[in-house]
A protein has these predicted regions:
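Beta-strand-turn-beta hairpins that frame and shape the catalytic cleft
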Residues: 31-37, 50-56, 149-158, 188-195, ...
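Active-site environment of divalent metal-dependent phosphoester hydrolases
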Residues: 64-65, 105-110, 132-134, 150-151, ...
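Pre-active-site segment of Zn-dependent metallo-hydrolases
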Residues: 29-31, 54-101, 112-115, 167-171, ...
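Active-site-proximal loop/helix segment associated with metal-binding centers of metalloenzymes
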Residues: 65-71, 77, 159-192
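Cap/insert and terminal regions of metallo-dependent hydrolase folds
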Residues: 201-290
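Active-site HxH/HxHxD metal-binding segment of metal-dependent hydrolases
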Residues: 67-70, 87-149, 161-166
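Gram-negative bacterial Sec-dependent N-terminal signal peptides
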Residues: 1-22
């Protein structure tokens, strides 16, 4: 089954080296006020993360509004994706990018437009060899598997786990296969804040473990609460998980992304803003609009 196209899959259902600075420890030099981590919300789950002079592009979906059919057997599948246009051109999005991280190859994280826009020799990290082989077959020549951790441009990136849906969903083989695997990533550099990008996962023990092990000061959650037809649970996080993250990492800033851009997201930014205000955690949670940048 070709994991590049989630719509088809759902219709069926219903390298790595560590530098001395990082060796042997997850405890790094305390953040320096002059060392800023920059995060730009591009659209959907696509974000740019910069540690100093090193910039990563995460999960690029760069197509024009309405390019693809809605994901079949999901919430609002009659709508075409993406729901909105980018705030800047794909050329502007990829400008200054040093490496790409594809947490998994579902269409809303790795699409044809991204494949067309990106240089074929750009360093690109995937979660496993299956995804790496797919992306190599698309013409990319510098694809690396993030089996555990790696160092790139002075930044340590570490793979974390999760599950892209509920146990009920994964008990159905025809659904478990297309949902597949998806990774999260922890970013660390001496003197900079640690950032944990959870990826397409629901709240699992792996999320707790990542927070306990790495003590992130910034946590990026895919919080659009994507829903499938016929199932109660979501396939990514939602508002209650944003609250849970704020409780699990009491000193961290929470950034909510993967919202308002593809059909099966059931939680809007406005609804999440109302929720976090009701919970009294609005000062802890950033919900950036497309194109907006944050500095940590």
């Amino acid at each position: 089954m070709n994991l590049r196209t989630l719509p088809l899959a759902l219709s069926i259902a219903c390298a790595a080296a560590t530098t001395t600075a990082f060796a042997g420890s997850n405890v790094l030099k305390a953040p320096d006020a002059s060392h800023k981590v920059d995060l730009q919300q591009i659209r959907n789950a696509t974000v740019k993360i910069s540690y100093g002079a090193t910039t990563f592009l995460i999960d690029p979906m760069l197509a024009k509004k309405g390019t693809y059919p809605g994901f079949e057997n999901t919430y609002r599948s009659n709508l075409r994706n993406p729901l909105v246009d980018l705030t800047e051109s794909p050329t502007e999005v990829i400008s200054g990018v040093d490496a790409v991280i594809v947490t998994h190859t579902h269409l809303d994280h790795w699409d044809d437009a991204a494949q067309k826009a990106l240089p074929k020799d750009i360093p690109l990290f995937t979660q496993h060899e299956e995804d790496a082989q797919l992306i190599r077959s698309q013409g990319f020549k510098n694809v690396r598997v993030l089996t555990d951790e790696a160092e790139f441009g002075g930044v340590k990136i570490t793979k974390t786990g999760g599950q892209h849906g509920t146990d009920e969903m994964y008990a159905v083989p025809a659904l478990a296969k297309p949902l597949g695997e998806a990774m999260g990533v922890v970013f660390q550099a001496p003197g900079y804040k640690t950032l944990y990008l959870a990826g397409d996962t629901i709240w699992r023990k792996e999320v707790d473990q990542a927070i306990e092990q790495y003590h992130p000061e910034v946590i990026v959650l895919n919080a659009g609460k994507a829903k499938m037809t016929g199932y109660e649970g979501a396939i990514i996080m939602g508002e209650e998980d944003v609250l849970r993250a704020s409780q699990a990492a009491k000193n961290a800033k929470i950034v909510a992304v993967h919202m308002d851009a593809v059909n099966h997201m059931s939680l809007t930014r406005e609804e999440l803003r109302t929720y976090v205000k009701k919970q009294g955690i609005e000062s802890r949670v950033d919900i950036p609009e497309d194109g907006a940048s944050l500095e940590f």
